Amino acid sequence: MTVPATSTRKDLMIVNMGPHHPSMHGVLRLIVTLDGEDVIDCEPILGYLHRGMEKIAENRTIIQYLPYVTRWDYLATMFTEAITVNAPEQLGNIQVPKRASYIRVIMLELSRIASHLLWLGPFMADIGAQTPFFYIFRERELLYDLFEAATGMRMMHNYFRIGGVAADLPHGWVDKCLDFCDYFLTGVAEYQKLITRNPIFLERVEGVGIIGGEEAINWGLSGPMLRASGIRWDLRKVDHYECYDEFDWEVQWQKEGDSLARYLVRISEMTESIKIIQQALEGIPGGPYENLEVRRFDRARDAEWNDFDYRFISKKPSPTFELSKQELYARVEAPKGELGIFLIGDNSVFPWRWKIRPPGFINLQILPQLVKRMKLADIMTILGSIDIIMGEVDR
């Protein structure tokens, strides 16, 4: 009896990764086609966290809509609030006091650090390094203490308002934040010592998921995904929004375009954010923290507002104003990339159209191309380096 020669196995295996799996970043489902350990194809399936955020906006005033926007990217809620108030501010040409602008910059950069920290921990856990996952919560708790002292909430802050912020910084907060900045720089140095030159870490990320500069532009990538491919593009420098021009800081970038480059960009961005925060805290001016002119009601004061129902059951409407009949695109540099809003007003208090441009949704589109011809284990490395939050992707 002759034994047949061993032939190369040609049958492919289809594996579903997610949507309910601890290794996935939210409720993302990947349909992966494998030939052994090699990835032949990958199809992301979205929509498991879709909540109709754009349609909800068309039936709410801006103030009523603010609590919803913190549920997009729930790890960097200051940015979703910022873009939600920036769009009507630009549409109505509403001026923001200098102190309010400084407070906004401080909160935005603290939120950027918090987002990058909670990217770093799970990313390292994805590739097998468990220790940094516990380290990042040490600094993150201090950040949330600062947020809680200033806004009353550890997450979902609901702090930004049209024309300023909801409340001034409490007494002693500036000194507490400066102490955190000094402490955090030692924490970043510890991360770099622990991770950056680790040979096992380098083996997992170096040369994995390479994106060229022209390719990144063609795919519409933004944020660290774009800057890690050699493109020095940061909306804080390009659009000159808030008061970023008044601070001395540099755009962080790398030219390699791989997962290691994206890691290095985010680590460096945390250090640059600390520089911006320190300058803002030391130079924060006095004055009002909101523009009182925008807090007006559309209709005259009603005598019924002093009755029991209105005083104790809170039936007073939110202060708001009409959105003029024009269109506008506003954007900010969020931790994950360009977060934009396309707003169309029609002389009512509700937006006629509220189109969200989420960075995670755009950045995720390149995933199938990056993982093809890679190993199965590299999928989590590449997906982690993209940094997505499904609340923002699905909206």
Swiss-Prot record:
<keyword id="KW-0874">Quinone</keyword>
<dbReference type="InterPro" id="IPR001135">
    <property type="entry name" value="NADH_Q_OxRdtase_suD"/>
</dbReference>
<dbReference type="GO" id="GO:0016655">
    <property type="term" value="F:oxidoreductase activity, acting on NAD(P)H, quinone or similar compound as acceptor"/>
</dbReference>
<dbReference type="GO" id="GO:0019684">
    <property type="term" value="P:photosynthesis, light reaction"/>
</dbReference>
<keyword id="KW-0472">Membrane</keyword>
<comment type="similarity">
    <text>Belongs to the complex I 49 kDa subunit family.</text>
</comment>
<dbReference type="GO" id="GO:0051287">
    <property type="term" value="F:NAD binding"/>
</dbReference>
<comment type="function">
    <text>NDH shuttles electrons from NAD(P)H:plastoquinone, via FMN and iron-sulfur (Fe-S) centers, to quinones in the photosynthetic chain and possibly in a chloroplast respiratory chain. The immediate electron acceptor for the enzyme in this species is believed to be plastoquinone. Couples the redox reaction to proton translocation, and thus conserves the redox energy in a proton gradient.</text>
</comment>
<dbReference type="InterPro" id="IPR022885">
    <property type="entry name" value="NDH1_su_D/H"/>
</dbReference>
<dbReference type="GO" id="GO:0048038">
    <property type="term" value="F:quinone binding"/>
</dbReference>
<keyword id="KW-0521">NADP</keyword>
<keyword id="KW-0934">Plastid</keyword>
<keyword id="KW-1278">Translocase</keyword>
<dbReference type="Pfam" id="PF00346">
    <property type="entry name" value="Complex1_49kDa"/>
</dbReference>
<keyword id="KW-0618">Plastoquinone</keyword>
<protein>
    <recommendedName>
        <fullName>NAD(P)H-quinone oxidoreductase subunit H, chloroplastic</fullName>
        <ecNumber>7.1.1.-</ecNumber>
    </recommendedName>
</protein>
<comment type="subunit">
    <text>NDH is composed of at least 16 different subunits, 5 of which are encoded in the nucleus.</text>
</comment>
<dbReference type="InterPro" id="IPR014029">
    <property type="entry name" value="NADH_UbQ_OxRdtase_49kDa_CS"/>
</dbReference>
<keyword id="KW-0150">Chloroplast</keyword>
<keyword id="KW-0793">Thylakoid</keyword>
<keyword id="KW-0520">NAD</keyword>
<dbReference type="GO" id="GO:0009535">
    <property type="term" value="C:chloroplast thylakoid membrane"/>
</dbReference>
<keyword id="KW-0813">Transport</keyword>
<dbReference type="InterPro" id="IPR029014">
    <property type="entry name" value="NiFe-Hase_large"/>
</dbReference>
